[in-house]
Amino acid sequence: MKSLILTTLALLPLVSCKPWVQLSHQTPISADRNLIPGAAEKSQLDKIIADSELLSLHRSLTEIESISSREGDVGDFLVDYLQKHGFTVEKQHVSSDGNEADKMKPSSFNVYAYPRSSPAPEIILTSHIDTVPPFIPYSLSLPKSSSTGSIDRRAIHISGRGTVDDKGSVACQIIAILSHLKSHPDARLGLLFVVGEETGGQGMHHFSRSPLNTSPPTFHTVIFGEPTENKLVSGHKGMLQFTVSVHGKPAHSGYPWLGRSAVSEILPILSKIDQLGDIPESEGGLPSSEKYGKTTLNIGFMEGGVATNVVPARAFARVAVRLAGGTVEQAKERITAAVRSASREYRADVRLWFFSGGGYPPIDLDTDVEGFDILAVNYGTDVPNLMIHDHDQPEDKKVKRYLYGPGSIFSAHGENEGLSVGDMEDAVEGYGRLIRAAVERGQRK
């Protein structure tokens, strides 16, 4: 991201990351907790996957590498698959930084699809098709019944990059829509699979600015797919990112008093920043809420100096803030005030940049469909990146937004990323329930 706002200040402090508390605890399943299948068992597993439209689709998606900015192959696969199943498919080419004025990269494009008889979907299911690096191949492991040694089908564990985040949701959404269309062929349903979610949401931003996102919207419901343990999400924390840099004076490390260490000066500034989630709002801290808990900060990157025998002339750090309440502007004001305070105390030469894009406050979501467990999450999604033009609509006409999907965020992005067959099959049923509820609500309008 590029920085838009530059504030020159003086600063100093250090940080501690707070754990996510809203999600239920789930330990990722590692290889040593599952059995590596032998040749005969592998044949059985392959047959189970091949005999299921859902599981074979999921395998095909996962076997295609689609790290952010390299989503072209998986996009082409989806275009072909959806066209064969009777969908009209539109491709939206997206540049690497989301700027349409730049040369488009044909390897990155959104996939927008709808039944040929329904060009204006009223219900959209959306997920992202990019993954974080590195690519991890698709694999199956084999939990067994201790008594009989037979395969527990629902417990078969599927591993690989993107199995959870987010190709599990992609596959389940497609199968859920196909299932609904079999019995309701005139249902106005659509699929939107976007690129670049893991690197800033360029794909969803592009769709938001495109003619496909009408004002007022043709759709009354959007169902976002992310790993939520098959629970319906009531909302997620907001997000704000910034960079802090300190300029010192270089000198020989044998005579440090002749220079000024930028590293020594940035540490107390970062420490001050890191405490903002624990300081009461009345004393200048960042907000907390009953729903989302505390605002948390993470110093995710820090760099400074050139050699151990040189007093460092420059140091900088990048910080991510997960907002539990308030507005982005309020958070910026609190952070800026904390930096100013530390800068005056330590007389450091400091600069503060808030990342472009502006950040976003906590995002509340709809949970009015019965039969789901509910939770709030700390991670970010594409939900705030979709600009919905319903601000002038009465409350009962505003677009519903749901967040749901298979797998756990605790295994997403990790070396043991994976989920079970049961997780996938339950998610198809859950998406089906959300679709049916949305259709019924649309008929009542």
Swiss-Prot record:
Q: Which PROSITE patterns does the record associate with it?
A: ARGE_DAPE_CPG2_2 (PS00759)
Keywords recorded for this protein, A-Z? Hydrolase, Metal-binding, Protease, Secreted, Signal, Zinc
Which branch of life, at top level? Eukaryota
Task: Tell me which CDD domains the record gives.
Answer: M20_ArgE_DapE-like_fungal
GO cellular component terms, semicolon-separated: extracellular region
Quote the catalytic residue positions. Answer: 197
Q: What is this protein called?
A: Probable carboxypeptidase UREG_07869
Which Pfam families would you find in this protein's record? Answer: M20_dimer, Peptidase_M20
